[in-house]
Swiss-Prot record:
InterPro entries membership: Gly_transporter
Biological source species: Escherichia coli (strain K12)
Residue ranges, Cytoplasmic side: 22-29, 80-85, 134-148, 192-207
Top-level lineage group: Bacteria
Protein's name in the database: UPF0126 inner membrane protein YadS
Length: 207
């Protein structure tokens, strides 16, 4: 039940992040709605299509789709000045949503009888897929291709989750919580101390 409600929170926060980016780009209401929804459900959609294990999650149960749409519309109406929001709020809630989405992705892969490598990949895709679609539609460099410790947190958390379950036979729910906590802590540490990955850069001479 806790994971269910955290999933709802994550869906809402991801939708808000899409709407805020659309607002900065001065999109019309339809564009705002599209960016909010694809950010919230895009990763899970890619995952379910890749696993080909039953219908896409929001087709089977439209709760997440409804949450994404309602959150997007409410954000359009209520958040006219994003600067009034505490700076820590969205990044922290985004970190919670990211951790939950990674855990859900790994679980779904294992339930589809996938191996640990694919499970970790599906967890990462669930966590970052929507953001990639959002940034591509907005013609921005996706966050995971920048120096932010974002996908890295997903990968490490997913590995902990998959290893605990597949190698050490930890119950799936317990392994899921372990992976979520690791993902969350890494992401929060990156936010708190502005941790970034080193960059790969070449000058004009290729040096």
């Amino acid at each position: 039940m806790l994971v269910y409600w955290l999933d709802i929170v994550g869906t809402a926060v991801f939708a808000i992040s899409g709407v805020l980016l659309a607002g900065k780009l001065r999109m019309d209401p339809f564009g705002v709605l599209v960016l909010g929804v694809v950010t919230a459900v895009g990763g899970g959609t890619i995952r379910d299509m890749a696993l080909d294990h039953g219908p896409v999650f929001w087709v089977k149960d439209p709760t997440d789709l409804v949450v994404a749409m309602v959150t997007s519309m409410l954000t359009i109406v209520l958040v006219r000045q994003p600067r009034r929001l505490p700076k820590w709020m969205l990044p922290v809630l985004d970190a919670v949503g990211l951790a939950v989405f990674v855990g859900i992705g790994v679980n779904k892969a294992f339930n589809a009888e996938a191996g640990p490598l694919i499970a970790v990949c599906m967890g990462v895709i669930t966590g970052v897929g929507g953001g990639i679609i959002r940034d591509v539609l907005a013609r921005e460099i996706p966050m995971i291709l920048r120096t932010e410790i974002y996908a890295t947190a997903c990968i490490i958390g997913g590995i902990v989750h998959a290893t605990a379950y597949y190698t050490f036979s930890v119950p799936l729910e317990t392994a899921s919580m372990m992976g979520m906590v690791v993902t969350l802590l890494i992401r929060l540490a990156a936010i708190r101390w502005h941790l970034k990955l080193p960059t790969f850069a070449l000058d004009e001479n290729g040096r």
